[in-house]
Every structure is written in C-alpha cells, then in structure tokens.
Amino acid sequence: MGILHLQRLLSMDRFGRSALKPVWAIVLLCAVIAGCGTASKPDENATPAAAASTLPPVRPSRQYSIEQFIDSTSVNGAFFSNDESKILFNSNKSGVWNVYSMPITGGAWTAVTQSATDNNYAAAHFPDDGRVLITRDQGGNELTHLYVIGADGVETDLTPGRNLRAQFIEFSHDFKYFYVSSNERDPRFFDLYRYATQSYQRTLLFNNDNGYDLGSISADQRWLTLGKANTTNDSDLFAVQLDSGKITRVSDHLGQASFQEQGFSSNSKWLYYTANDHGEFAELRRVSLDDWKHESVQKANWDVQYSYFSRNGKYRVTATNEDGSTRVRLFDGASGAEIALPQLPAGEIRGLTFARSEQRIAFYVNGDRQPNDLYVLDFGGKPRQLTQSLNPVIDPADLVNTQVVRFESFDKMVIPNILWKPHQASAQNRAPALVWVHGGPGGQTTRGHNALIQYLANHGYVVLGINNRGSSGYGKTFFAADDGRHGREPLWDTVAAKHYLQSLDYVDDAKIGIIGRSYGGYMTLAALAFQPDEFAVGVDIFGVSNWLRTLESIPPYWESFRLALYQEIGDPKTQRDFLIETSPVFHADKITKPLMVLQGANDPRVVKAESDDIVAAVKKNGVAVEYVVFEDEGHGFSKPANQIVGYGKILEFLDLHLKGVAAGAQQP
C-alpha cells in the first residue's frame, strides 16, 4: 500500500498540492541514498567569501542551445507489469507526455498512449493482465479523468462527465478492487469510490461532505485515513471505519502542528503518520488500530518526508529532507532494523517503487548535471540503467554542481539557498546574477537537475535559489514565518539575497535580476513594484498579480483548504485592503525595470487575466515588457516545443537587459 501512497503524493505534487502548504507549493519528492551524494550541512556562520571559495575553480565551458538542453529525454513514473517483466513509465519525447512500456532488462520502448495534444500519465498496471490505468486532462486544465486501456488498446473513460476531477488512489490488497476519488457529486469535495477490477462496477464508499482530504485504505478494507487542514501550519488526521462510518481523531495535540498519514501496515494493525507536534521537525510514528496507543518509529533533526512499505511489509523505506536533499533509508519491515543498501548510482533517488514480489525495485537517479534516468535493481544484484536521458551532445562536465549557502537576512534570520555558479565566472570575469524564487508559498528550492537553471548558468548567469522564510524543510517556525506577511518579510529576504550576491567577487553587482514561477512569479512582481530600485530586471512565470482575484477564483475542488489559504495569504472578504496593498497589479505604476511575463492560457490556478492585467499596466509606464502566452498549457509548461520557445526567450530577454546583448549578436 505504501508505494501507492507515495505515488499519490507525487501526483498531488504535479497538480500543485504539497503535504504542507497544499495549494501553491510544487515540491519534488526526491531522495538521496545514504552515502551517495548527500550534501553535508554547511557552516551557518560561514562568510560569503568562505562559501564562494569552496566552489569549483574557473574552467572553460562549452555553451549549448536551448534546443540541445530540451532534447534531453524527460521520464518519470514507474509501475511493474503483472509478471514483472516490463515497466510502465511516462515520457514527453513525442512532444507531449505519453505512457510507455519497456522490458526491465532494457530495450525498445512501446507506446501505450499516442496523444499529440493532451498529456497522459500512468496511474497503475493491473495485477493479473495487461490492462493499464492512465490519467489525462485537457490542455493543462487539471480536470483529470481516469481511463483504462485494455490489452487490445481500447481506451475507456472510467470517470465520464463534465467539469469533474478524478484521481486513482490504489488497488485493494487482494486486487479485487481499486479506489478512485471524484468530485462529480459536489465540485467542492472528493468522495471515495470502489471499482471492481474485472467489471468496473462502482460503489460509493465514503460520502465526503465535510471537506476531508482522502488518504489510504487499509489492506483489510476496514479503514480510510482522512486529513483536515485547519491552517497551513496546523492539520489533523482521522481514521474512519468504512462499515460504520465512525471517525476517530488520531491527532490529539495542543498548538499548531501538522499531521500527515503515511499509510497502513500490511497486516492492518498500525497506521503510520508523521507529525511535528513534539518539535520543529516531523517525526514518524504509528498508532495501533486496536487500542489507539502511539509509538515513535523514527525521528531526526530534519523532517521525515515520507515512509511506506513494500506490498507485504517485508521492507519499509523512509526519507528525510536534509538541507535541500532527501536521504533515503531501507528498513526491515518486521524488526525495524536498518538494511544496508547495495552500491547504487550517486545522486538523488526519486520515485522508488517496490515490485509486487518484493524482489526488485525501480527508481530514478537525478543529479545537478543529470536529468532523471530509470533504473531497476534486483535485491542481491546490481542496478540496471534503462534510460540515457541527457542529450549525448551535452558533456556533463560543462554543467554545474549546486552548493548550499546561507546568509543573514535584514533581521539576522539565517536564510538557506541553493547556488549555481557558472564555470567561467571569476573575479576577473564577473557574471550577471539572478535570485530564483520557488513556488508556494511553502515550497523549497532543492538540489537536482533543473534544465532552465542549468541553461542560464551555462550561458553565464549565477543563480541563487532562495529558500526565503516560509519555505518548507527547515522547521515549523521558519515555515510559519511568512504567514500574513507576503509582500513584506519574505520579499525583504530576496533583497538580502541580492546583497549576498553582491558580496561575491565573481558577481557583477550592478546586474542582478529576479525570476520565479507561480508564487515565485508573484515575488518577482512584488520586488519590482515594492522594491523598485533593487533589481535590474524581472521574469514572472505565471505569477499572481492580484490576490483578490486569485483567492476569489480558486477552483471549487480546493474547498478543503480554502480557509487555510485565507489564513496564509488573507481573506478577500475581511482583509480586502491588505490584499490590495500586497497585490502588485495595484502598484504597477511603480514598476520601472524591464519585465518579462510567461503564462499558460489554460491555467486554473493563476488565471491568464492575472498576467494580462499586469502586462497592460506596466506598459503604460513606458517600460520594456515582453509577454509570452502558450495556448495549450496550464500551470507549468510541459511540452518541449513550448519550453524551447519560453526558455529561449527568457535568455534573450536577460541577455538584452542585463548583458546589453541583442538576440543573435555574438557575445564576447
């Protein structure tokens, strides 16, 4: 059950819902195997010069085009076939995301879906035959349906209807059924349905009229976990008996604390969960479903990010979020003893999946200079690499490794960051720089491959990925430090980040811009509007410009955390003046620096009107503005053709306004 729980979390991430601040954060669940590329915690008292001195020496670096960067293959997802001879996964190599299958020994890919327009993602492989489950929306509108593709290739929509959103949860332990959530009855809430594996006959199991977030189902099919977001920093966990409807609160606590379910044990005796009510960081616990007594399972000086079992409980995997990287450990499911893993490829491990037999796993390796590559490991054997994702034209040595650095902000709060330094930057060859702001609020900039940032670094830009106050991964006090303060203290952290960059001898201190996606796009606009003299240029990628509109137009299926969002950002009914004060569109007359805006026309979270309005308002100032709209994208640009256009235009814009080099001109 546990791996399905993780896959559900990964799916939630794809649609912008993290376990902590669920509406906005886009947080990659990734892991680093112990001893394989895990970054040690830097000295928090290190001076900027000391931090800079640990970076690699200056060296020549070949520059690559955006076409060459995007020509690397993107892959994710991993599902073993019923006989474990093949693996199901996703790739956008055709120009949109489609589902593919390949032998676990490697070899040719077989296309399971062949869409030329809408993205398809694998949800599961059926346990006893060749059928597969996939999900698909329309042009990025996030109204996903669940489809079954038969062994004959015929596709059937299992969740027909208009304006609904459905998601696969998991198969029952006996594989006679599978579970699906859908908001077809009430667009605000997701109900739980059970489908018969053979006939697809559907039964409503849980009528969700109170806005719970649905979780895992126990192997004996008696229990369902429910989550409830009170605020972005406080949530409760419940377990409901499906036969009687009796709900038991698991999360008795005082004060603000977050509780997140981590699935049931395979014998249905224990419910595992993480909670941070005993300190700054989330620890792993379990509660007996017989007497409701709680036990601590694992704690660390960082958040326990997730934990799950193999199918029959032989193994348990746990990951901790450690300073922008996540460390994975494997345990014996019965004794709890840690199991030494065989030598695995260095780098971050993502999307680890146990086979049904518990004899092998599939996972992705991802590093700063390495996009996702799929591996299969038979326990007792050596890992087999199934994909070669990096464009062979690109020499990994020309890409850059990241470094964790810290600086003190305006009020002495220590701010963690991820730094990308171009090979060619030096005190004699100072480079322009960018402050990169993650999504959220409540996201986290992490280590790992980022094609856009590597592209910018490859073309001579220092990039500082700030984890401003309010970011996840650094304790609940730090996480809550931005509540009700957006457009103020978190923004002032970005100004302090600029000052940190100016302290580095290889940065041109007069050529520093700001860039971000989603909430990071809002921060970009806020920086240009509220701190107009600080940054030389801004790039807003589908960012909020008007909090009033955004909060009043949220999709109905966000109802379960609408009030928590109001607590975080502001209530449009009772805090209208505050939201106007913190919305850049109402202060666009103060924006005097060049601005670029990129937007998906089908974005349901930051609607296109947000970008239309800020672009029109800034143009009235006589400021250089470039606006790029993709008609077939939503909240994120998933199609390689659009990435090539969008990312390429970002570099051209930055080169013109930070380097003074027009598109197509030869750079020195």
Question: What residue ranges belong to the model's regions?
Answer:
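C-terminal motif of bacterial Sec signal peptides marking the signal peptidase cleavage site
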Residues: 33-35
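Bacterial signal peptide processing site
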Residues: 37-40
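Conserved beta-propeller blade repeats
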Residues: 72-90, 116-136, 146, 162-181, ...
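Cap/lid segment of the alpha/beta-hydrolase catalytic domain
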Residues: 388-510, 517-518, 552-562
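N-terminal secretory signal peptides that target proteins for export/translocation
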Residues: 1-20
